[in-house]
């Protein structure tokens, strides 16, 4: 789109539709396009008659927030446009909402959650917003007996699905043994199933061992164990709780994005307006365990 001329966009939509025959074409406004006010939604409305693919416009490309707000808007856009009505709900099926691939190693977390829910509750995943899923799975989101929200950005989407399909949601992230036990209890209550007793016993045994870890933190020296956690809001909260249960003091809970999209952020979670601010904190640490992404770790002192 140049100087308001959308001819190239119109031609691109027709060419994509004929060449690839996609089920859906997403039209995303860039920051410049959003700022100058190009009517992307209007273009999609009148071009819908010219193509077979369903056109979905995303016009939130401005500068009003960071990527966490963009994620929340994207999840809402998808659940408002893709899930089909009339899909029968099935027992033992769930959707995951808020699994952003921007989050550090989220694919590993999703794999672990799917394995855990299968073993403990006999549940199967339908769709995962937005990590390794398909249009067909998103269309069938109404099948789910429960929606599992792994990130604050997915809450609005889960609430919309609850209104549209009557599907309850559980907002919990299973970090640490205590967090995992709580997660299983909440999901089990939502689907009317009791978690497998052997899985619970295994987790409870490990939880007790972790609780005793704090007794050994003073052995050998008198230095208190310290840590810093940096990442997305829910990851920081979950991992910090796990460390504190083991007797490790978390000095800084550093959120990698702004807290604008968080309704009631915890008072001890820090968001930094400038990159230099959190870099100064990281570079000044000594004798401290740092849990963060590769970029942050490379900035830390070797000690």
Model-derived features: positions:
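An N-terminal assembly and electron-transfer interface module characteristic of large anaerobic redox
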Residues: 1-303
